[in-house]
Amino acid sequence: MCAARMAAAAQSVYSFSAHPLAGGEPVNLGSLRGKVLLIENVASLUGTTVRDYTQMNELQERLGPRALVVLGFPCNQFGHQENAKNEEILNSLKYVRPGGGFEPNFMLFQKCEVNGAKASPLFAFLREALPPPSDDPTALMTDPKFITWCPVCRNDVSWSFEKFLVGPDGVPVRRYSRRFPTIDIEPDIQALLSKGSGGA
């Protein structure tokens, strides 16, 4: 089934799976039922790589015990800022950017496309469920030379490090632009975690 048809048929992220960056069996997102998910398309050479990767680690470390799961999906569609091979990405993060021995403590998956005909079915679904980022409803890729995919849609991801927050029922709740710092999503995450635990 093509990505668009899979996305149209889905009611939650639990319909999708993804291949871990380290290899092995695909992770069925249904196995994360009951967790709050923060999903980001990431890149090793973006201007916000250091900020967002370190903040993703921070949120996973502090809120993971309360049922937050951070998921990163490397993508090379924006300025070719993830041009490493899958097997090179962890070393790039460790030694280049963020560097200093950095290791992600959250799940990273194999490179995928998030826009266009070859978009990951998960991202096609997320874009349909949450068309504009909540903090920047007019966010668009505005420089034609950077548009490397087809077809171009109004709900396309506009750059690396867009964020999608998914509730414990697997339904997307909110989308944030690349300009929105990952750490600033914490109040929304805390609200979902409290709701999921009955307000405890």
From Swiss-Prot:
Matching SUPFAM superfamilies: Thioredoxin-like
| Enzyme class, first EC level, given as a word | oxidoreductase
Processing after translation: During periods of oxidative stress, Sec-46 may react with a superoxide radical, irreversibly lose hydroselenide and be converted to dehydroalanine.
Q: Which UniProt keywords apply?
A: Acetylation, Cytoplasm, Lipid metabolism, Mitochondrion, Oxidoreductase, Peroxidase, Phosphoprotein, Selenocysteine
The principal location of this protein is cytoplasm
The site feature described as Subject to oxidation and hydroselenide loss to dehydroalanine is recorded at U46
Where in the cell does this protein reside? Cytoplasm; Mitochondrion
Where Phosphoserine occurs, the residues are S31, S194
Top-level division of the source organism's lineage? Eukaryota
Recorded GO MF terms = glutathione peroxidase activity; phospholipid-hydroperoxide glutathione peroxidase activity
UniProt cross-references to CDD domains, sorted A to Z? GSH_Peroxidase (cd00340)
- Which residues are recorded with the post-translational modification N6-acetyllysine? K85, K111, K118, K145
Q: List the InterPro entries.
A: Glutathione_peroxidase, GPX_AS, GPX_CS, Thioredoxin-like_sf
Q: Which GO terms describe its biological process?
A: arachidonate metabolic process; glutathione metabolic process; hydrogen peroxide catabolic process; lipoxygenase pathway; response to hydrogen peroxide; response to selenium ion
What is the role of the protein in this entry?
A: Catalyzes the reduction of hydroperoxides in a glutathione-dependent manner thus regulating cellular redox homeostasis. Can reduce small soluble hydroperoxides such as H2O2, cumene hydroperoxide and tert-butyl hydroperoxide, as well as several fatty acid-derived hydroperoxides. In platelets catalyzes the reduction of 12-hydroperoxyeicosatetraenoic acid, the primary product of the arachidonate 12-lipoxygenase pathway.
Which proteins does it associate with, and in what oligomeric form? Homotetramer. Interacts with MIEN1.
Under the heading PANTHER family, the entry gives: GLUTATHIONE PEROXIDASE (PTHR11592), GLUTATHIONE PEROXIDASE 1 (PTHR11592:SF41)
Q: Family per UniProt?
A: Belongs to the glutathione peroxidase family.
Q: What is this protein called?
A: Glutathione peroxidase 1
In the record, what lineage is assigned to the organism producing the protein?
Answer: Eukaryota, Metazoa, Chordata, Craniata, Vertebrata
